[in-house]
């Protein structure tokens, strides 16, 4: 396999943050010697998450075995995932905002056609449903654990407790038609075909669409981590990957 130098479009605070967390982890478990330093392990993990490179390619580039690369990356991802903010913590910080934006996105996977629970009829592909909360400026605040793609957005929001938690905090949420009937403080557009809506309802829907569209940058931010654009791992690991990416994003934006 040929090896070549490559760049990573991340800032040094990402590397310093993860390196420090890995050093703490090594001290906690009493790890003495490893093939890679904490800094190199952090760089390996960031390259995997940001660029989506497979373990074999990364292993060749870092001069380690594929199994070792997998083990190092899994350890670092678990460390990051444990630091991701909970929904309650996000709601507390969002209580000062006028409203939040709620939307769902599908993270495509390489599931086969027989895996019906992971097939999204809306997106016509297999994947995992992740709910996203953003502030009024479109900045990513929180991403939920991943559920099978066949689950509709409103059901996913309920299962994660998003509807009740934000309602209890009195925080208004703007969402699309996929959340119709959610209740609480969720604001959705007027239901019906455009031509059957009154002039006032059409105006409301246009205004609603402009506000709700602000969530798109938050979803795009999540998917700048290229690994999430086409997941080839076990579905049981996807929640950890999403939480790890969320931790790194919030670290870099602070």
Language-model segments: residues:
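Charged, often Cys/His-bearing segments associated with DNA-binding zinc-finger transcription factors
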Residues: 1-32
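Ser/Thr-centered flexible coil motifs
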Residues: 11, 37, 196-199
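Short, amphipathic alpha-helical "recognition" segments used to contact nucleic acids or chromatin
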Residues: 37-51
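Short secondary-structure transition/capping motifs
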Residues: 7, 33, 47, 62-65, ...
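Short, well-ordered secondary-structure "scaffold" segments embedded in the functional core
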Residues: 57-74, 78-254
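Short, flexible segments with low predicted structural confidence
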Residues: 15-16, 29-31, 40-43, 66, ...
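A cross-family signal for key residues in well-ordered alpha-helices
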Residues: 19, 46, 158
């Amino acid at each position: 396999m040929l090896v070549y130098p490559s760049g990573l479009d991340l800032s040094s605070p990402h590397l310093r943050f993860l390196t420090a967390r890995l050093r703490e982890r090594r001290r906690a478990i009493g790890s003495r010697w490893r093939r890679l330093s904490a800094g190199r392990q952090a760089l390996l993990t960031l390259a995997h998450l940001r660029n989506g490179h497979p373990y074999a390619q990364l292993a060749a580039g870092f001069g380690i075995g594929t199994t070792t690369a997998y083990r190092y990356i899994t350890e670092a991802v678990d460390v990051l995932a444990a630091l991701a903010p909970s929904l309650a913590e996000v709601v507390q910080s969002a209580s000062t905002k006028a409203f939040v934006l709620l939307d769902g996105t599908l993270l495509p996977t390489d599931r086969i056609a027989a895996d019906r629970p992971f097939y999204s009829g809306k997106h016509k592909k297999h994947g995992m449903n992740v709910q996203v909360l953003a502030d009024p400026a479109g900045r990513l605040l929180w991403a939920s654990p991943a559920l099978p793609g066949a689950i509709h957005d409103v059901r996913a929001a309920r299962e994660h407790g998003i509807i009740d938690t934000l309602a209890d905090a009195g925080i208004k949420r703007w969402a699309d038609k996929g959340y119709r009937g959610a209740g609480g403080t969720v604001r959705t557009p007027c239901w019906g075909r455009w031509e059957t809506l009154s002039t006032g309802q059409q105006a409301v829907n246009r205004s609603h669409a402009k506000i709700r569209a602000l969530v798109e940058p938050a979803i795009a931010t999540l998917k700048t981590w290229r690994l999430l654009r086409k997941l080839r791992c076990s579905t049981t690991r996807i929640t950890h990957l999403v939480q790890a990416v969320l931790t790194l994003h919030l670290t870099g934006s602070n």
